[in-house]
UniProtKB/Swiss-Prot annotation:
The gene is bamE. One of its GO terms (molecular function) is protein-macromolecule adaptor activity. PANTHER family: OUTER MEMBRANE PROTEIN ASSEMBLY FACTOR BAME. PROSITE patterns: PROKAR_LIPOPROTEIN. Part of the outer membrane protein assembly complex, which is involved in assembly and insertion of beta-barrel proteins into the outer membrane. InterPro entries: BamE (IPR026592), BamE-like (IPR037873), BamE_dom (IPR007450). A lipid is attached at residue 19 (S-diacylglycerol cysteine). The lineage of its organism: Bacteria, Pseudomonadati, Pseudomonadota, Gammaproteobacteria, Alteromonadales. This is Outer membrane protein assembly factor BamE. GO terms for cellular component: Bam protein complex.
Amino acid sequence: MPIKNIATFFFLIFALSGCTSLYDTFVYQIDVTQGNYIEDEKLDQILLGMSQEQVIFILGSPMLIDQFDSSKWYYIRYIKPGGEPIQQDKVVFTFDNLLLTDIAREGTIDINPLIKTPKARNVPNAATEDPSTSDNPQTDNDTPVIVN
């Protein structure tokens, strides 16, 4: 009888160990990035009327070309940073006679959440502000640093 109780106890321990919510807090989860890296600078270079070859030269190959309508190209970027919510950015290019006619963008990615950017310094505008009243006073040897 005690062996049956011990076996039941271990069975319950192993069965209930799969029902834990500690997975998200204690287990390391890698950052997952898939798809095309869509930079605003490169997207600003795309103009209506460009050919498909010019778009490929600037942004690279699209993630998806619609099977039923080959005039639509999808550039999709998917990010899942660790245990945080999934973010997705999508840009759809529509072509007519091999020329770009429409650009549609939707998504939740503002900046790359996987890259930690340093805080930008407040550099006073010499024409409108007095440098001595800024957050970071400069001496004659300091050069203003602008962080992208």
